[in-house]
From Swiss-Prot:
Its EC number is 4.1.1.11. This is Aspartate 1-decarboxylase. One of its GO terms (biological process) is pantothenate biosynthetic process. Belongs to the PanD family. The active site is at S25 (schiff-base intermediate with substrate), Y58 (proton donor). GO terms for cellular component: cytosol. One of its GO terms (molecular function) is aspartate 1-decarboxylase activity. The gene is panD. It is an enzyme of class 4 (lyase). Is synthesized initially as an inactive proenzyme, which is activated by self-cleavage at a specific serine bond to produce a beta-subunit with a hydroxyl group at its C-terminus and an alpha-subunit with a pyruvoyl group at its N-terminus.
């Protein structure tokens, strides 16, 4: 049996930009992508802490070191600049993989700077 498990999470990311006219996606600072082992064009689930919205899109690379979290296209309707997001990726795993698996959690602070990286 396969289970869909949390693979990585950027916790309390702050939206820095929202561009309704862009063709879609979520731009994420490359440093944050590396820290969470997330990849460009990977599907992500986003949870808006401020308003409870839940939505999905895909990743595009943001400028390294910028702290960028930009919502583009339809996703820009789901959050405002300054809103806090939880950004997650999931992966299918079999029972053997699940037994000893720990997701990668990246806790963010002001300016989307990394406060802590942990496996829960």
């Amino acid at each position: 049996m396969q289970r869909n498990m949390l693979r990585a999470k950027l916790h309390r990311a702050t939206v820095t930009q929202a561009d309704l006219d862009y063709e879609g996606s979520c731009g994420i600072d490359e440093d944050l992508l590396d820290a969470a082992d997330m990849r460009e064009y990977e599907k992500i689930e986003l949870y808006n802490v401020n308003n409870g919205e839940r939505f999905s899109t895909y990743i595009i690379k943001g400028k390294r070191g910028s702290g960028e979290i930009s919502l583009n296209g339809a996703a820009a309707r789901r959050a405002h600049v300054g809103d806090k997001l939880i950004i997650c990726t999931y992966a299918p795993m079999n029972e053997e993989e699940v037994a000893n698996y720990k997701p990668k959690i990246v806790l963010l602070g002001d300016g989307n700077r990394i406060k802590e990286i942990k496996a829960v």
